[in-house]
């Protein structure tokens, strides 16, 4: 009888320990994408010196786009085409961007030219694009050519009524959404706060995708934050998320959080001065 109880207790402890360990060491995934690569050599270099899991989004029209593509590939970063797209405002976008009213042939041509400049890209995200990503016709043309080019799509969510994700799924293109903007404000404390928001979002939802820019405060926060990343958070590249069959993040194991999104931009997402136009 004593042996029976000892065995039962031992098995219970082993089971409980395994369950606790599985919960304790489950890691949230944090993906970081740095937009606007290709304009500033110094800042771009600091981004490329970060761990390879930090993904880079290169603007095809940027003067150093081809060079950055090769450097990022050499250093094993996941690369995105940061495609200029028409905003709701009248801000001029870079040459070769996507605007309302383009024909399907024109969209195809511009995407192919962008891919030729950034040939190692595995996906695309939008630079501005609050008008473009809300336009069903334009997004249908875009997702069709992205499927043909075997490119994924990351919706930067510059407007709440974006149809990019819906149409991408209809067209068979793997798509994910941005969750947190790291540097809507370039203030150091604000960037630090947004980085912590991304960590909390990853803990709650299992996955967080944060977008930032090659600015001094953003670089400083990321260097320190990545170096001291909590044990329960795993830094991952965008490719690993896109290729994962389970694109939608799993529900939290225990619902102890408020159902309030991480503090990022709020609809309509447009009044973000530091995200407008050609990067400074």
Regions found by a protein language model. Name each.
Residues 21-23:
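N-terminal signal peptide c-region/cleavage motif recognized by signal peptidases
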Residues 30-34, 54-56, 79-83, 124-126, ...:
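Hydrophobic faces of well-ordered beta-strands that scaffold small-molecule active sites
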Residues 30-34, 95-105, 184-189:
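Active-site mouth loops of central-metabolism enzymes
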Residues 2-13:
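Bacterial N-terminal signal peptides that target proteins for export
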Residues 26-91:
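Active-site beta->alpha N-cap acidic-glycine motif
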Residues 148-158, 217-280:
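C-terminal domain-boundary segment and adjacent tail
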Residues 72-120:
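Substrate-binding cleft of extracellular glycoside hydrolase catalytic domains
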Residues 104-196, 201-203, 213-234:
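Catalytic domains of cell-wall/extracellular-matrix polysaccharide-remodeling enzymes
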């Amino acid at each position: 009888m004593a042996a029976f109880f000892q065995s039962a207790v031992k098995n219970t402890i082993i089971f409980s320990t395994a369950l606790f360990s599985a919960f304790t060491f489950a890691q949230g995934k944090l993906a970081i994408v740095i937009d606007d690569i290709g304009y500033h050599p110094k800042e771009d270099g600091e981004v490329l010196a970060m761990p390879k899991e930090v993904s880079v989004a290169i603007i095809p029209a940027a003067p150093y786009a081809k060079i950055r593509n090769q450097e990022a590939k050499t250093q094993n970063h996941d690369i995105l085409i940061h495609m200029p797209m028409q905003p709701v405002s009248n801000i001029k976008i870079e040459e070769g961007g996507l605007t309302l009213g383009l024909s399907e042939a024109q969209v195809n041509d511009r995407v192919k030219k962008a891919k030729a400049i950034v040939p190692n890209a595995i996906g695309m995200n939008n630079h501005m694009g609050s008008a473009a990503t809300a336009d069903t016709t334009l997004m249908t043309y875009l997702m069709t050519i992205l499927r043909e080019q075997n490119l994924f799509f990351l919706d930067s969510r510059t407007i709440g009524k974006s149809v990019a994700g819906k149409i991408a799924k209809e067209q068979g293109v793997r798509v994910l959404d941005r969750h947190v903007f790291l540097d809507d404000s370039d203030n150091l404390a604000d960037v630090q706060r947004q980085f912590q928001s991304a960590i909390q979002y990853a803990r709650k939802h299992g996955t967080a995708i944060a977008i930032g820019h090659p600015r001094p405060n953003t670089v400083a926060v990321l260097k320190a934050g990545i170096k001291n990343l909590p044990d329960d958070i795993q830094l991952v590249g965008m490719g690993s998320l896109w290729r994962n069959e389970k694109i939608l993040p799993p529900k939290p194991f225990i619902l102890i959080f408020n159902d309030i999104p991480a503090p990022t931009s709020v609809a309509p997402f447009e009044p973000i001065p530091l995200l407008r136009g050609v990067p400074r």
